[in-house]
């Protein structure tokens, strides 16, 4: 009779636990997390927010069945020079952002750190313009400072 693959016994717990760990590498999410693959590919390098300079304003067409041009900006990050597209949330928000402004961007909050809703390929949103919160500019509480 051939031997058993698993150890059985009162003191076999450590061996059993180590054995189970091997199978976790078959799980794609576990593998990505352990090898830090998403962090390596992330333009923000794992940080929650990043500063950047606005290069240009761009209009991104919404995916079907919606029909709109979502107002976005191309931003060059200060810390590594990478370029990303960031969404400008709010009615008329794009009017408060000019080229060469310094903006702070953060993740847009889509599933698995990806794009949200009908805006294809846009993973970030603008939070601040020239060190003033975009939401405050939209409410009219603060005027945008000149840099």
UniProtKB/Swiss-Prot annotation:
GO terms for cellular component: small ribosomal subunit. GO terms for biological process: translation. Transmembrane segments: none annotated. GO terms for molecular function: rRNA binding; structural constituent of ribosome. Part of the 30S ribosomal subunit. Belongs to the universal ribosomal protein uS12 family. This is Small ribosomal subunit protein uS12. The gene is rps12.
